[in-house]
Amino acid sequence: MSWKRAKMETVVQVFDPFAKNEDGEFSKNPVELPARSFKQVIHWKDGEILIVETQDEQGQLLHFYYENKDELLSISLNDNRTLETEDILPYQLRFRSRYKDDRSRALEETGIIYKAIAYHISDDNHVFLSIGDFESGHFALLNPKTYDLISIHNRLWLEDENWLELKIVFKNYETYRWQTYAKVTEYFLDNRLFKRATVSKIRTLSRLPIKGLQEQAWKLRHLQTATLQNDYAL
């Protein structure tokens, strides 16, 4: 990773992966849900800081994620639009860290616990570097020459012991300040698109605006504590 500190902005589109047409069949084209879209401002310092502000189209804060060394806060702020941590994390940044522990954590955050490394040849004879357990469905594929992340694969188990295939695809790679990054990240359930994140702005920074972000995290942490005390008051 060539960047030490960066600010990234993304626009996230959300789709209904199981929308049906008039005949009751799954729609061939994904149906976008504009009211569910959101945007993000991401501040990142390799190995130390990851702060994600997730906002609606009007700029109202929906979720705030604050990670600064050992400090961690992840809070959903809109009762009508609950977002979990896995909904908002920009996975490619941690995957490209220069620090082994961060790269390992990125794998674990996407369900890849067993980290065996091997070459994988696809049906169309493309060669990838595979990390994880290919047979179990929990693995990541990388370009063996550039180490660019190509895709992450996982399985979401259902109550009836069946599963849905989760696939995250990283594509349209561009280069900024000697570092490649995926301009577009797409999320699929059983090969049906349900989310697309597009990087709209990116720049490296000499310093993060950490003081203001720390103050915001402090206020939100105390708000969360006060809300819990109120909700569970006897």
Which functions belong to the PLM regions below?
Residues 46-50, 124-126, 134-137, 144-151, ...:
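Coil-to-beta-strand transition motifs
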Residues 42-44, 63-70, 89, 99, ...:
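Aromatic-rich beta-strand edge motifs centered on tyrosine
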Residues 11-17, 25-26, 58-59, 79, ...:
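Non-transmembrane domains of secretory- and envelope-associated proteins
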Residues 52-54, 75, 152-153, 168, ...:
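Beta-strand-dense domains in secreted/periplasmic systems and polymorphic toxin scaffolds
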